[in-house]
């Protein structure tokens, strides 16, 4: 059963009424089944209408939905022969960032991304997708490996931001983020990044400075969370909705600003309502972007990437 968000309360109420009618209709009442069908049509229309005009803050809530597909779901959906590669060869293996070798269609790729986890135990293990320095250093190692063997890099971004703990700072969090961003820009192979949920600050761009940046329709991408922005500007997190509006966090706004190259449509009601369709759409979009970049020389790829990010702002 779908977990409904706060703004979806009218839809949830309709669905509860439909379930109630259908459980009663099991006794054989055709009139009740007919009424349930009418309510189902009304619910579907309400869902479409609601998602056609989401505010930036509502999109932020959708991007954070616990049932949205995560890195492991995407890998299982469109990467075959996946072979995970662990560790930064310096300190530890950070499970907030996962990466490895695999195939996207007939193309060999290096795939890297944030994993948030899907239950309490896995969320703790993956630190809710908030990477530490060793996570970004693992990403650097895998990108350098891909460059050495001529493999395109695919990055899936879904993080509220890099982990801000004191131990992470002591181990050089800022330096690791900067080096990872630099590693993206220095690649001589094609790189495609996709923001699939939250794209939070440097923790996101550290693995997203790519030739082509994709973004799901209801994903968000920003320098700070709306709550964080509100607490700084208004001294209260209650202004998060206003902050989300002001920061232009949505895919449509960011495409207009040139930060995002392509917006990938989601199923009606968000990726969490039809994960298989969302995963298939993203896999196809990434494949198309890699096709466009195939055959380009390393110098051209680096120059295009550099020019793209220098032009932002």
Curated annotation (Swiss-Prot):
Pathway: Lipid metabolism; malonyl-CoA biosynthesis; malonyl-CoA from acetyl-CoA: step 1/1. PROSITE patterns: COA_CT_CTER. InterPro entries: Acetyl_CoA_COase_a_su, ClpP/crotonase-like_dom_sf, COA_CT_C. Its EC number is 2.1.3.15. Keywords: ATP-binding, Cytoplasm, Fatty acid biosynthesis, Fatty acid metabolism, Lipid biosynthesis, Lipid metabolism, Nucleotide-binding, Transferase. It is an enzyme of class 2 (transferase). The keyword Nucleotide-binding applies. One of its GO terms (biological process) is malonyl-CoA biosynthetic process. It is found in: Cytoplasm. One of its GO terms (cellular component) is acetyl-CoA carboxylase complex. GO terms for molecular function: acetyl-CoA carboxylase activity; ATP binding; carboxyl- or carbamoyltransferase activity. It catalyses: N(6)-carboxybiotinyl-L-lysyl-[protein] + acetyl-CoA = N(6)-biotinyl-L-lysyl-[protein] + malonyl-CoA. It comes from the Bacteria. Residues 42-292 form the CoA carboxyltransferase C-terminal domain. The keyword Chloroplast does not apply. It holds the Pfam family ACCA. Acetyl-CoA carboxylase is a heterohexamer composed of biotin carboxyl carrier protein (AccB), biotin carboxylase (AccC) and two subunits each of ACCase subunit alpha (AccA) and ACCase subunit beta (AccD). Component of the acetyl coenzyme A carboxylase (ACC) complex. First, biotin carboxylase catalyzes the carboxylation of biotin on its carrier protein (BCCP) and then the CO(2) group is transferred by the carboxyltransferase to acetyl-CoA to form malonyl-CoA. Belongs to the AccA family. This is Acetyl-coenzyme A carboxylase carboxyl transferase subunit alpha. It comes from Rhizorhabdus wittichii (strain DSM 6014 / CCUG 31198 / JCM 15750 / NBRC 105917 / EY 4224 / RW1) (Sphingomonas wittichii).
